[in-house]
Each structure stands twice: as C-alpha cells, then as structure tokens.
C-alpha cells in the first residue's frame, strides 16, 4: 500500500490511517518515516526524492545535520548554505561524496543555466563544480549532503507497501529547514486529518 497527501477510503497508514494510491512516488516528493520504522538510520527521517526512474530511486535525508561545517569541506559554497551551515548526512551510501540541493527564488528560470538541474517545483540539484557566483542570484539557499539514500528498482515501492514510509508533497522550504525544528512533525502537522495526528507521536516511544 502506498501513501500520498489525501486519505482514500479502504486503505490505511499503519494502524487506522487512511492511505491513497501509489502513483505519487516521484522526484520532488518526501518520504516520511512511519512510526513503525525503528531502524536508527531512518527513524523519524524525512527524505527528499531527487530521482525516481527505471534505474531506481535516490534521495537525501533532510533532517540529519552533522557537526562538519560546509566551510571546512567546500569553503566556496559556505556563504550560500542555509543555517545551520553544516553538512547534512544524506544517507548511508557513499558518505565520502557530496550532493547539493537548492531552493530556487520564486519566479526564476534556470533553463540553460550551467550548474543547476531542475528536480521539481522550486527545487534543483547544484553541480558543486560550478561557480557559486553564477548560482547565488538564482537561489534562496543550498544544502550540502554527505552521502545519499538509494533503492534498487521496485525496492522502495515494496517498503512503501509495507508501510515503512508515507509519501507526501514537499514544500520548497523543507530543503532549508533549520535543524532546530522537528521537520518530521512539521511535515505531518500540515497534512489533513487523520494523518496530522501522527505528528504527536513521541520521540521516545517509551513515553507513548
């Protein structure tokens, strides 16, 4: 069973939460870890899907800041990095590789712009070999990730069907959300009932 933004009669999120059809799994959407996903790497994680195609799925975890400053790794990009200006852990794959997302300014076009590749809406991938001065006028900010999360063909669909993930729409601000905010709860709170009730699920399950 897959999930989206609107509940549909006859399917459920976990225990009693209604779920819509599967076709919304695509680049630019969010994967929200369900409350039954206890694996430390992904517990209460919010993953932005960068690519979803016949080759599989690639995404980055938006709410796992590291203690490594962007300036210490990519000093030329530090000025554009959103607060906190640290590297984020995008996932368990290729932790020694950097991947960068940007939130575009409203109304800008990046057609023909070297160094930016549109993902969805106002979200774009940034080529870290590009010149930051060329990118700066077009973006509200960037987020740099160490590593990523990846799934082979059909693997993610299976995990969604197993209720490990809830698939929801992303807002441009999600990519740059400050680490001090609970992005997992924030995304759930903006959903319609009954899904928004999951935002009250305690971080420490022993308190439930």
UniProtKB/Swiss-Prot annotation:
A GO-annotated cellular component: cytosol
InterPro entries in the cross-refs: AlgH-like (IPR003774)
Gene3D superfamilies listed in its UniProt record: VC0467-like
Highest taxon of the lineage: Bacteria
NCBIfam families in UniProt: PRK00228.2-1, PRK00228.2-4
HAMAP family noted in UniProt: UPF0301
Homology family: Belongs to the UPF0301 (AlgH) family.
Name recorded for this polypeptide: UPF0301 protein MAB_4928c
Natural source organism: Mycobacteroides abscessus (strain ATCC 19977 / DSM 44196 / CCUG 20993 / CIP 104536 / JCM 13569 / NCTC 13031 / TMC 1543 / L948) (Mycobacterium abscessus)
């Amino acid at each position: 069973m897959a999930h989206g933004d609107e509940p549909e009669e006859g399917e459920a999120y976990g225990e009693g939460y209604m779920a819509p059809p599967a076709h919304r799994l695509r680049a630019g959407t969010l994967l929200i870890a369900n409350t039954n996903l206890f694996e430390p790497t992904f517990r209460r994680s919010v993953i932005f899907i960068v690519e979803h195609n016949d080759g599989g799925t690639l995404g980055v975890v938006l709410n796992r800041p590291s203690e490594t400053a962007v300036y210490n790794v990519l000093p030329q990009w530090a000025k554009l990095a959103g607060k906190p200006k640290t590297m984020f852990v995008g996932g368990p794959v290729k932790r020694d590789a950097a991947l960068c997302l940007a939130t575009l300014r409203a109304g800008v076009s990046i057609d023909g712009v070297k160094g930016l590749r549109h993902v969805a809406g106002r979200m774009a991938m940034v080529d870290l070999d590009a010149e930051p001065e060329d990118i700066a006028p077009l973006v509200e900010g960037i987020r740099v990730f160490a590593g990523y999360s990846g799934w082979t063909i059909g693997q993610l669909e299976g995990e969604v069907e197993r209720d490990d993930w809830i698939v929801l729409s992303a807002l441009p601000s999600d990519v740059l959300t400050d680490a001090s905010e609970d992005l997992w709860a924030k995304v759930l709170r903006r959903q319609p009932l009954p899904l928004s009730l999951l935002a009250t699920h305690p971080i420490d399950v022993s308190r439930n």
